[in-house]
Structures are given as C-alpha cells and as structure tokens.
C-alpha cells in the first residue's frame, strides 16, 4: 500500500515528501537494504519458521476487499514486543529514526480478503491473525510465503497509523504455540450481547490501553458475532480514540468545573503542544500549526498551515474534517486527565509541527504527548484570553491568525497589538 493510496495528493507533492524523508535520514534507506539479508538468514525454504509476531495490520485500500497481514520482526524475535506501537515508546524517548527502523524490520505477511469473512472464524490465516491480535504477548507463528518481500515503506501522510515496512504475500499461517489470551478478552468474545462500542469501553475501564483495544477491534474480535468485521488499522485507531473519548466525556460533563485557568506544555519528536484548561462547561478545540518544510507542509517556501476542529458540550455529530485522528487522540488525553481529577473544563490544545517532524510516525505520539503534558509544571493565567495571548508569544503566528482559524480564540476581545 503506497502513500498515494492513503491520501489524494499531487504527484509533485508526493515526490517532495519522499525527497524530504530521504534527505533527512539516509539511515532508514540503509536499514531497508539490510532487511533482505536478515530475511534470507531467517527463512527456510519458502516459509518463515519461528517468527514471533507482536501484532497485525489491516489495510483500507479497495475496502471492503482489503489486505490483511501478520507483522513479524525479522531477526529480532527476542525483543519482538518493542516493535509494536505502544505507550512505552514515549517512555523510551524514541526518535523518528527509531520508529521507522523498527517498522522497517517488521515483515507484513499479508493476503487479500473481504472484511466480512472474519465472522467467528478461528481457522486458517484469519484465525491465526486473530489469535495474534487478542494475545497479551507476542506469539510464535509459522508463515508460508509466496516469493520474497517487497522492500518498501508505507508511511501515511495523514499520520494516523504507524508506518508499515516490507511486505510479502502469505499462503498460510499457523500457530507454533498456544497464545496467552486475557480472561477479560475471552469474556468479550464469548458474550454475544455486547456491541463493539460496549466491549471497547468494558476493556478500557478494566485497564486495557487503547493500543490493545485497537488491535483486537482491527482483527474483528469485538462486537456481536454477526456484526464482526475486519477494521482497517487506520480506522480502528480513530474509532477507539473516539469511542473512549465519548465515554469519558459522559463521565466529566456533569462534574464540577476546574477552578482557574491552567496552562500545560510538552514537546516530543518535533511537535510542541500547549493545553489550556479554563473554567466552564466542556468544550474542546484542537488547532494545528504545520511548519513549511515539515512532512505535512513540504514546500519550504510555503507559509504556516493552520487547521482546526472543535466540539461543544454535547460533542460532535459530524466528521472531523481538518485534524483527523490527531483530534481524537488529543481529546482522549485531555479527557483522561479531567476524569481522573473529577472535573470538567473548556479545553484548547495547540499543536505546533516543526520542520524537525520530517516523517509521520502515527497519532500515538500526540496521544502520549498530551497524556504526559499534565505531569509537567503547570502555569496559570487570570483569564482564558490571557492564557491564549501568553501561549501565542511562543508560536510562529499572531493571535489574529489564531482568531481567523479558531472558534475559541475568535471569542477573545481584539486588541490592536494582536495583529503584530
């Protein structure tokens, strides 16, 4: 699955994105070239024996006929778990290079299928894939392959899913061990009364993080049996963040408001985040500023690109048009913090994407950056307007620019100096 299958972009823009990535890190290209050597050392005949799989991937191109695969880190069986996207990546302080190098080591052994074929099947390739998805640790699998892998890296310009590395067509897949499946996951599989949203919330309330739930949902292992479907990875990430966000909003919207205006900041792999919480009923907005020369805005001569989406007290009913998965990931982080405190607030998140963010690594970095922002030192302000003005001092745009794009900022009283 190539970049142009994720997003409609002009050919010259696609070329510019590739040029930017190659210019920023030749090490990733070198890593792809060494993958072939590791692959040939690992494969016996035409099968990959003893590969340890930490996760799966479901594509979205040609939906409902999709490419679905089992991910295996070739030559890295002992630390297979570290190759799967998780909150631990933030704790490790991974770089963009680290993410791309780990993902280029993951062989995507895939085959085409209809999303409806999963139903309650536990046999064959789809059955093995599902076992990998619901297990709470990497599973040893034996995969029969047709030919050598295609050495390429698919990185989505929408930056929702983590990049996917080399891929090969799979003839078969079999378990080489009995996977360990948590009892709570077994319960959601056996209880046919739950819809997918209810099952997601059940697992989340009992300590499962979004990463685990996303993989289980993507494999078609949640919901009523006749309604179970494979869910493309990109869609499942957003669906889980959105579903859990709606649940948490319901928990906080009747709580007491925060007492004063609070400002939090965090920075991670070329992204800077500001979170402003102010007294009042629940309201949320995400503003994104994307610098020229970044993967989002590759023309170095272009101006700063601004995008924004928001919701009021009752939430959203329409599609998030401009900020996509980043909106749901950042909102979840804010709502988790408020729910833990037993408070509600009106919340403004500002994300500044610098030109250091040269390759899209997925919305996990947004989710974790917001989650950890609240662990840092908090600043305060007299009013919401003062907080926005204070934060704007650190942004490459004026308050007037924000007011033109942001509904929440547009409500501030205008001062002549805001146009400076």
From Swiss-Prot:
Any Pfam family matching the protein: Nre_N
Observed phenotype of the null mutant: Non-essential, but cells lacking this gene are sensitive to DNA damage induced by treatment with MMC. Does not display increased sensitivity to UV light or to the alkylating agent methyl methanesulphonate (MMS).
Family annotation (PANTHER family): DNA REPAIR PROTEIN
InterPro entries associated with the record: Nre, Nre_C, Nre_DNA_repair, Nre_N
An annotated GO BP: DNA repair
Residue window of motif PIP motif: 413-420
NCBIfam families from the UniProt entry: DNArepr_NreA_Halo
Protein name: DNA repair protein NreA
Family, per entry: Belongs to the Nre family.
Its biological purpose: Involved in DNA damage repair. Works together with the UvrABC proteins in repairing DNA damage resulting from exposure to the DNA damaging agent mitomycin C (MMC).
Encoding gene (name): nreA
Key words, A-Z: DNA damage, DNA repair
Complexes and interactors: Interacts with the DNA polymerase sliding clamp (PCNA) via the PIP (PCNA-interacting peptide) motif.
């Amino acid at each position: 699955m190539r970049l142009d299958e994720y997003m409609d972009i002009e050919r010259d823009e696609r070329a510019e994105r590739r040029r930017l990535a190659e210019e920023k890190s030749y090490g990733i290209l070198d890593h792809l070239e060494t993958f072939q050597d590791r692959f040939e050392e690992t494969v016996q005949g035409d099968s990959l024996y003893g590969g340890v799989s930490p996760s799966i991937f479901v594509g979205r191109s040609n939906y409902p006929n999709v490419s679905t695969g089992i991910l295996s880190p070739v030559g890295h069986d002992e630390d297979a778990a570290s190759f799967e996207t998780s909150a631990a990546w933030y704790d490790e302080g991974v770089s963009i290079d680290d993410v791309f190098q780990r993902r280029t080591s993951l062989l995507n052994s895939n085959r085409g299928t209809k999303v409806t074929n999963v139903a309650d099947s536990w046999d064959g390739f789809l059955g093995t894939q599902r076992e990998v998805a619901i297990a709470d640790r990497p599973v040893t699998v034996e995969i029969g392959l047709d030919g050598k892998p295609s050495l390429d890296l698919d990185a989505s310009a929408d930056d929702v899913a983590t990049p996917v590395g080399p891929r090969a067509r799979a003839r078969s897949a079999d378990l080489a061990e009995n996977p360990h499946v948590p009892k709570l996951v077994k319960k959601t599989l056996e209880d046919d009364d739950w819809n997918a949203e209810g099952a997601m919330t059940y697992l989340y309330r009992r300590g499962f993080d979004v990463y685990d739930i996303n993989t289980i949902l993507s494999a078609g292992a949640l919901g009523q049996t006749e309604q179970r479907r494979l869910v493309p990875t990109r869609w499942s990430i957003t669906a889980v963040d959105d579903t859990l966000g709606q649940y948490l909003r319901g928990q906080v919207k009747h709580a007491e408001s925060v007492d004063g205006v609070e400002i939090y900041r965090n920075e991670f792999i070329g992204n800077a985040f500001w979170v402003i919480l102010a007294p009042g009923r629940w309201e949320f907005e995400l503003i994104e500023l994307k610098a020229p020369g970044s993967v989002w805005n590759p023309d170095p001569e272009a101006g700063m690109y601004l995008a924004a989406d928001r919701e009021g007290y009752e939430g959203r009913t329409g599609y998030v048009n401009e900020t996509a998965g980043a909106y749901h990931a950042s909102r979840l982080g804010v709502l988790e913090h408020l729910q833990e405190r037993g408070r509600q607030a009106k919340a403004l998140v500002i994300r500044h994407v610098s030109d250091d963010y040269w390759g899209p690594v997925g919305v996990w970095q947004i989710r974790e950056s917001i989650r950890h922002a609240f662990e840092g030192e908090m600043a305060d302000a007299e009013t919401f307007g003062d907080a926005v003005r204070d934060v704007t001092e650190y942004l490459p745009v004026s308050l007037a620019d924000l007011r033109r794009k942001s509904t929440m900022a547009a409500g501030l009283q205008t001062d002549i100096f805001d146009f400076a």
